[in-house]
């Protein structure tokens, strides 16, 4: 059964966290971060926040540390901005979907280049 409320809450959390990243967070470890999705459990106690970041592996690790250390800040600000009885616990996870998509695109491009032409 699909629960519409966690989906709506996830969308709202995505908007609010993105806004907080732009205007409120002052951690230098958190650079060019994009929140790609937020998945909220049906009981509304856990939200997985998926993000991408511009940079190499070292930048990703620093961003992860920065986001984890800012989790109390995010929860406090979300509690002020949203009318919810309980603000979900936030778990930040790097979104590998973009890398996966780029890899598939690269493989398809290689296949097209290696394909002999039928002229």
Curated annotation (Swiss-Prot):
Q: In its keyword annotation, does this UniProt entry include Oxidoreductase?
A: no
Q: Which GO terms describe its biological process?
A: maturation of SSU-rRNA
Q: Which cysteines are joined by disulfide bonds?
A: none
Q: Which InterPro entries match?
A: KH_dom-like_a/b, RbfA, RbfA_dom_sf, Ribosome-bd_factorA_CS
Please give the coiled-coil regions recorded for this protein: none
User: Which PROSITE patterns does this one have?
Assistant: RBFA (PS01319)
Q: What is its main location?
A: cytoplasm
Q: Kindly give the SUPFAM superfamilies that the UniProt entry links to this protein.
A: Ribosome-binding factor A, RbfA
One cellular component term (GO) for this entry is: cytosol
Kindly give the Pfam families that the UniProt entry links to this protein: RBFA
GO molecular function (one): ribosomal small subunit binding
Q: Where in the cell is it found?
A: Cytoplasm
Q: Which UniProt keywords apply?
A: Cytoplasm, Ribosome biogenesis
Quaternary structure and interacting proteins, as annotated: Monomer. Binds 30S ribosomal subunits, but not 50S ribosomal subunits or 70S ribosomes.
Functionally, this protein is described as follows: One of several proteins that assist in the late maturation steps of the functional core of the 30S ribosomal subunit. Associates with free 30S ribosomal subunits (but not with 30S subunits that are part of 70S ribosomes or polysomes). Required for efficient processing of 16S rRNA. May interact with the 5'-terminal helix region of 16S rRNA.
Q: Which HAMAP family does the entry mention?
A: RbfA
Regarding protein family, the annotation reads: Belongs to the RbfA family.
UniProt protein name: Ribosome-binding factor A
Q: Which organism is it from?
A: Syntrophotalea carbinolica (strain DSM 2380 / NBRC 103641 / GraBd1) (Pelobacter carbinolicus)
For this protein's source organism, the top of the classification is:
Bacteria, Pseudomonadati, Thermodesulfobacteriota, Desulfuromonadia, Desulfuromonadales
Q: Report the gene name.
A: rbfA
């Amino acid at each position: 059964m699909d629960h519409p409320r966690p989906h709506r809450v996830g969308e709202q959390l995505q908007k609010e966290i993105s806004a907080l990243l732009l205007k409120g967070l002052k951690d230098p470890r958190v650079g060019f971060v994009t929140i790609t999705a937020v998945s909220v459990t049906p009981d509304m106690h856990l939200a997985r926040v998926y993000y991408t970041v511009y940079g190499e592996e070292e930048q990703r690790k620093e961003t992860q540390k920065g986001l984890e250390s800012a989790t109390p800040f995010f929860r406090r600000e979300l509690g002020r901005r949203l009318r919810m009885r309980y603000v979900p616990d936030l778990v930040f996870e790097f979104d590998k979907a973009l890398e996966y998509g780029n890899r598939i695109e690269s493989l398809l491009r290689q296949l097209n280049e290696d394909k002999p032409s039928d002229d």
